[in-house]
Regions:
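N-terminal Rossmann-like FAD-binding beta1-loop-alpha1 element of flavoenzymes
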Residues: 2-35
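N-terminal FAD cofactor-binding segment of flavoenzymes
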Residues: 23-27, 31-80, 156
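A conserved beta-strand/loop capping segment in the N-terminal third of enzymes
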Residues: 52-120
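Predominantly flavin-linked oxidoreductase catalytic cores and closely associated redox partners
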Residues: 108-233, 245-251
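FAD-binding beta-loop-beta segment adjacent to the flavin cofactor pocket
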Residues: 181-184, 240-262, 312, 316, ...
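Short FAD-binding loop at a beta-strand-to-alpha-helix junction that anchors the flavin cofactor
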Residues: 189, 195, 255-273
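Flavin-binding catalytic cores
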Residues: 208-238, 261, 282-307
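C-terminal helical "tail/cap" subdomain of flavin- and related membrane-associated enzymes
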Residues: 286-385
Length: 385
């Protein structure tokens, strides 16, 4: 058995692992970091989009080299109102993450290396090699989600090459004027070039199964409805993000491995209501880059503490998720978001960043809820509707 030695091994080359590796390469260049990924590339096949308000000013250096598309504003559309929000929107393409990580880490970015097991100080690879390290961070996606009560944000996205310019210049992050199927459904569009449009069909659904053919057909119908002629589908992606209503944090943390540091989805570091993990991934990468002790025990204690505090601080978001899934009838869930997007854009930005103030929370709950009051109270208290 061949044994490799390093200071820190990061297992999982997705968004969380990639950002940690890049932050350490910048802030701790003397540290020998190995990024271990079972797939052929870092980041897989994804787009990650975020609002400029999602990332603190002091952390922007982490994502700045990765941004492939920038817009000064974004839009939302609902049956009863439409709104342009003058908050910047950014997109990272996984191919760019892969390129930048490989440039910075070179041979220390170990793709095509499946990890069979990881503990606080070692990683065992499927090819028989073993990596021994002062510390290990496991970022290999979600733990056992059955330990959490979840709804799902599931989606299929197609990057469309069009026969003629589409004429758009602003992302529409929610177009809920589409038929409400399988819960709260909306189309999501990113104008990537004058003739290229990324279109995603998304549902806040009770089930995680993704019917790629059905959602792909809806994307085709949506494009036709916009008057676009599709030359080809240049790229496709699909997924289902957990929307957390409740659960046992400690059991979830342990399900991803005992006594080993974890980050990203595996640590439960994602927004309970949206399922998005980029803001937490950036904050975690910055935090790790500021550390001095990279031993397995120190990293586990640090990240477990962060994840547990974050879970406790996000009770409000889990309550809102319960209201969305338990209090609203599936075809009427869009009304919850319709009302939300009439609020102050700064409040909306803090919500997505996971940094809502007490005043924000009061404002979100003020007034007549867009769902039956009795069901709303039951959801708030964590009772079945």
């Amino acid at each position: 058995m061949t044994t490799l030695s390093c200071d820190l091994a990061i297992v999982g080359g997705g968004l969380a692992g990639g950002l940690i590796a890049l932050a350490l390469a910048e802030m701790r260049p003397a540290l020998d970091v190995r990024l271990v990924e079972g797939g052929a590339s870092i980041g897989g096949n994804h787009l990650w989009s975020f609002f400029t308000s999602d990332v603190g000013v002091g952390d922007q250096w982490i994502v700045e080299p990765l941004i492939g598309h920038r817009w000064p504003a974004h839009r939302v559309r609902f049956p009863a109102h439409e709104r342009r929000i003058d908050v910047g929107y950014r997109t990272i393409v996984s191919t760019r993450l892969n390129a930048v990580v490989r440039e910075r880490l070179r041979e220390r970015a170990m793709t095509g290396c499946k990890a069979l097991a990881a503990n606080a100080h070692a990683v065992v690879l499927a090819d028989g090699r073993r990596i021994e390290a002062r510390g290990v961070i496991d970022t290999r996606g979600a733990g056992d989600l059955s330990l959490l009560e979840c709804g799902w944000q599931k989606f299929v996205g197609h990057e469309l090459e069009l026969a003629a310019p589409h004429g758009g210049d602003t992302p529409t992050i929610m177009d809920a004027t589409v038929a409400q199927i399988d819960g709260y459904r909306f189309a999501y569009t990113l104008p990537l070039s004058p003739t290229r449009m990324f279109v995603e069909d998304t549902c806040y659904s009770d089930t995680p199964g993704v019917d790629a053919a059905a959602l792909g057909a809806r994307i085709g119908a949506y494009a036709a409805g916009q008057g676009w002629t599709v030359k080809q589908v240049a790229r496709e992606e699909a997924g289902a993000l957990p929307v957390v209503l409740d659960g046992d944090f400690e059991a979830y943390w342990q399900s991803g491995g005992h006594n080993v540091a974890k980050a990203g989805m595996r640590a439960g570091l994602f927004h309970p209501t949206t399922g998005y993990s980029l803001p937490d991934a950036v904050r975690t990468a910055a935090l790790i880059a500021r550390q001095r002790d990279y031993s397995g025990t120190a990293l586990c204690d640090l990240l477990h503490g962060v994840a547990k505090r974050t879970w406790e601080q996000r009770r409000f978001y889990r309550m809102l998720a319960r209201m969305l899934f338990r209090a609203a009838e599936p075809q009427m869930r869009y009304k919850v978001l319709d009302r939300f997007y009439r609020l102050d854009p700064a409040l909306v930005g803090r919500f997505y960043a996971g940094r809502s103030t007490i005043g924000d929370k009061m404002r979100i709950l003020t007034g007549k809820p867009p769902v039956p009051i009795g069901r709303a109270f039951s959801a708030m208290l964590g009772r079945p509707a």
